Amino acid sequence: MLSKSILTGLFGLALCANAQTEAPVVTDNCPTDLYHSQLQIKDNTTVRGYIDAWTDSEIGMTFRVILTGIEGHQALLYHIHENQVPEDGNCYATGAHLDPYGRGEQPPCDIGNPATCQVGDLSGKHGPAFAPDGTEFIAEFRDFFLSNVPGNPAYFGDRSWVVHAPDKTRLNCGNFEKIVPGGKK
């Protein structure tokens, strides 16, 4: 009898561990803030580009992503990561994806249910970057789960974004910077 109780308890804990926490819609963003991140100029990749983020209301953020140098008809992944890129430019030092609600990477993000994805999984929520050779990828989308307010768990303004190959190799990265009228902060 005791072993059945223990097994039942362990099963319940396993279910709780696999339960996904949905990210809340951000409703207190600052409509005057603009963030920009430029990818590095690196010898080991042709991928270049930038990402901008802004909002005209308190709900969600609008992102514009432009990437060039996507070779071989690849669909590249891109995410906001926990840490900034260090001065040596090491994209692997940026840590894991921004995931303040502990969702984890498995199962993969469901583009049809973005509240259940990692907050920083931009390509999972909005689609991967693809462009034929010699052309650029351009995407603009609204993300309701990221924040431009310091102190919010989903705040991205002091973090980085990383572009990955399909096998998750980190190709390039850059830090977000807040842009103020007349120049960078």
Where are these regions (language model features)?
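Fungal secretory targeting signals
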Residues: M1-T21, K185
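N-terminal leader/targeting pre-sequences
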Residues: A17-K185
